[in-house]
């Protein structure tokens, strides 16, 4: 027992306390909003336990805290090996999506392996992608090869995401890669070229690839509010403005019954209206 407290003291002494408290604060803030803003959605719209989303989030946050603590006590070399192994495993999961993935609302992004809860492989892959690319950028001294190798790692992930289709995650993982190479000290001119290429490719996909036509329609509707296709966005905007500075109060919001995905896509609007 003494050895345990000694190890815990060493861990506490070396941990970045500001980041730890910031993470825990965001965890508990998310739990609070999940409790007060999704109970009516769960009971009225999904006809299930009022605390369904809260308990679901509580379980995953508990697992997240345990994993966070476990990984933080590992030595760096062991952490790197674990990250590389899980990067390959999650990449295999992502490769499985086109073949056995579950299609939801026109996009095939989810896996259901039976023994595990349904999940999106890209959500599991992202943290390991960050570690893997960071290793390539830090350990490879040849400037050309380290950026080339990191780009080669990124390319199959992007192609798999585009095939789902999931442009949002494609842009997100690309921006993560751009951030990593920027922090690594890349030449600003080269970084600017990569950035322009990313913007140009995203624009092409949105306006000229039929898979992403729904995004083009959303953009056109957003900039042309008179088209009448902005019902959900307009309701969300009305909810935010209707809440005012102090909000309507817990459980007094009206957006829950006006949009189909109030507990996910429009949760910020739900919170803004009530608080």
Functional labels for PLM-detected ranges:
Residues 37, 127, 173-175, 254:
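Short hydrophobic alpha-helical segments that form membrane-spanning helices or hydrophobic packing faces
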Residues 75, 129, 133, 163, ...:
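Helical mechanochemical/support elements of P-loop NTPase systems and associated helical scaffolds
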Residues 2-21, 25-26, 32-164, 230:
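Membrane-helix boundary/helix-loop-helix interface segments in multi-pass membrane proteins
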Residues 104, 108-110, 193-275:
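Hydrophobic, glycine- and aromatic-enriched re-entrant/interface helices and adjoining loop segments
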Residues 140, 144, 163, 185-186, ...:
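Short coil/turn helix-boundary motifs
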Residues 73-84, 113-116, 141-142, 188, ...:
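Membrane interface segments of multi-pass transport proteins and intramembrane proteases
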Residues 84-91, 145-162, 167-207:
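Hydrophobic alpha-helical segments of polytopic membrane proteins
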